[in-house]
Amino acid sequence: MRVLGGRTGTLLACLALVLPVLEANFLSRQHASQVLIRRRRANTLLEETKKGNLERECIEELCNKEEAREIFENNPETEYFYPKYLGCLGSFRAGLFTAARLSTNAYPDLRSCVNAISDQCNPLPCNEDGFMTCKDGQATFTCICKSGWQGEKCESDINECKDPVNINGGCSQICENTPGSYHCSCKNGFVMLSNKKDCKDVDECVLKPSICGTAVCKNIPGDFECECAEGYKYNPVSKSCDDVDECAENLCAQLCVNYPGGYSCYCDGKKGFKLAQDQKSCEAVPVCLPLDLDKNYELLYLAEQFVGVVLYLKFRLPETTRFSAEFDFRTYDSEGVILYAESSDHSAWFLIALREGKIEIQFKNEKTTKMTTGGKVINDGLWHMVSVEELEQSISVKIAKEAVMNINKPGSLFKPTNGFLETKVYFAGVPRKMENALIRPINPRLDGCIRGWNLMNQGTSGVKEIIQEKQNKHCLVNVEKGSYYPGTGVAQFSINYKNESNPEAWQINVSLNIRPSAGTGVMLALVSDNTVPFALSLVDSATEKLQDILVSVESMVIGRIEAISLCSDQQTFLEIRVNRNNLELSTQLRKDSFHSEDFQRQFAILDEAMKGTVVTYLGGLPDVPFSATPVNAFYQGCMEVNINGVQVDLDEAISKHNDIRAHSCPSVWQKTKHT
């Protein structure tokens, strides 16, 4: 506060105005003398012309309010000063102003008390924590704040962390406000850089290499992760990777097989299902090439049973009756039994068969045993009328009413008993006890059809009525040459793949002509116990209406030809050659090779299996686990197979599903024919 000079009134007048009546006591003689001596003003004519002075006017002497106004020359300072001035007088003038003493006891004397009144910064009005300096003014003051404080008295902390200009206080991560300041800090997993603002990630994987145990440590911002391979999850207790049992989550529609690090879904191909594109759900194996499966109950199918006869009839006729048989016959098969007849006591028998495509007759009676083969080849897939008639001294065989054989015979074929000729007739087979009693052994299985039969001149003998409701005894109306796999079973063979000159060597050379009617199925498989060390399959391709050809060892695919068109009315030639070191897979348009170096484990598995005993299956798999191969559906369609240079005859199989047709295949369904 400025201290200004001015005119001063008389001290006595001032005291007369301001002193309360109760305090206006007379001074002692000693004090009165001292006052008069010490406070005597200069008696000069120039006194009133001097500039007002606080020391002279209000300390050395007493001043009134007007005189104080003349000192400060402004009202605000005067109004501020004078009440406090009176307080100082009350404290330090003996016997005066005793009521104000308590508020001024911080000063040692009157001079200190009065001089302090004009300093607005004393006592300090500013916040001690926030001010830097206090600037005195006219009845006012100004607090100069330290950095980080604001307000009239520097009482308010500035939150630097919310400064819109300096976002987050310039901290890269955490800004913490403090009274008058702030500081930056880092999140867990980070350390502060020397600039005290930016944070740097801590690489825990480098600091503690064993922190994840057997898992892989991956550093991430502010932390780390212990990673396991797909199909595993991290165990923080053991610090290792545990296999995830995905099958427990019911991810697969049918069968789920869990294995270390993964799982596989399987569908029951034997029931007509395959794995969908999502590799989890199952869908029906679709037909990609419709076939003409129309049947006629008037056509008797001779290959209904792989083992045993198709039909058995017994005749009891007058003793004058002679044996006769007439029928229409159609086949592509080259060998098999058409009819077999015998007497009731089994002493005489008569056989009509086919060998190398020609009619063969074998018979035995009480006088002779004979066998004759002759006539033209009739296994051309066309209908041929065949008649066999016992004459008085010979047996006549006719094809299309033209005699092709005339066999002499002494006596009757069958001897009457008790005035009757009792005869048993078997279709497409012979009684088991007679299989080894024939003059020349023959494979009795015959894939063929007969119609319009007339046995012993008795017409159809009620056979039509017997077979009418039995679909499996009906023949297909339209067939072509080939072998047909309906997708319901397999054919089993025992084939030696070993090289006779080198017992350690083996070879699988397979050629196939295929015309699939479904795009997924196992064509050929070699089985060892419950494992499948080799399989040749086809699957529907990811490309619509195309198929892939797969070669697999157990559950691993080691060869593939992708996206070829197999479902057409034309057959596709496929060849595969395999030995212990190499695999070649080829079609008419493409040839691929796969070497043991690429699939060492798989070729080792195959080599070990081939040194032992394997069973060959065509058309599918036996009862092995779903997971044994990538594909387990039965093959559906036509297929002819040659293995190591030998054409496979399904009639020679160890076992065969009855629905598999060894030498006939349904024709492709023609839309125009059925409209």
From Swiss-Prot:
Matches recorded under PROSITE patterns: ASX_HYDROXYL, EGF_1, EGF_2, EGF_3, EGF_CA, GLA_1, GLA_2, LAM_G_DOMAIN
The gene for this chain is PROS1
Q: Cite the Gla domain residue spans from the record.
A: 42-87
Task: Mark the residues carrying the PTM (3R)-3-hydroxyasparagine.
Answer: 177, 219, 258
**Protein name as it appears in the record:** Vitamin K-dependent protein S
Task: Please state every residue range assigned to the domain named Laminin G-like.
Answer: 299-475, 484-665
Do the record's keywords include Transmembrane? no
Residue positions where (3R)-3-hydroxyaspartate is found in the record = 136
The residue ranges of the EGF-like domain are 117-155, 157-200, 201-242, 243-283
What is the protein's known function?
Anticoagulant plasma protein; it is a cofactor to activated protein C in the degradation of coagulation factors Va and VIIIa. It helps to prevent coagulation and stimulating fibrinolysis.
Pfam families reported in the protein's UniProt record: EGF, EGF_CA, FXa_inhibition, Gla, Laminin_G_1, Laminin_G_2
Q: Per the record, where is site Cleavage?
A: 93-94, 111-112
4-carboxyglutamate carried by residues:
47-48, 55, 57, 60-61, 66-67, 70, 73, 77
| Tissue-by-tissue expression | Plasma.
**Matching CDD domains:** EGF_CA, LamG
Where does it live in the cell?
Answer: Secreted
User: InterPro entries attached here?
Assistant: Coagulation_fac-like_Gla_dom (IPR017857), ConA-like_dom_sf (IPR013320), EGF-like_Ca-bd_dom (IPR001881), EGF-like_dom (IPR000742), EGF-type_Asp/Asn_hydroxyl_site (IPR000152), EGF_Ca-bd_CS (IPR018097), GAS-SHBG-PROS (IPR051145), GLA-like_dom_SF (IPR035972)
Coiled-coil positions: none
Going by the UniProt annotation, this protein carries glycans at 499, 509
| Propeptide segment residues | 25-41
Single Gene Ontology MF annotation: calcium ion binding
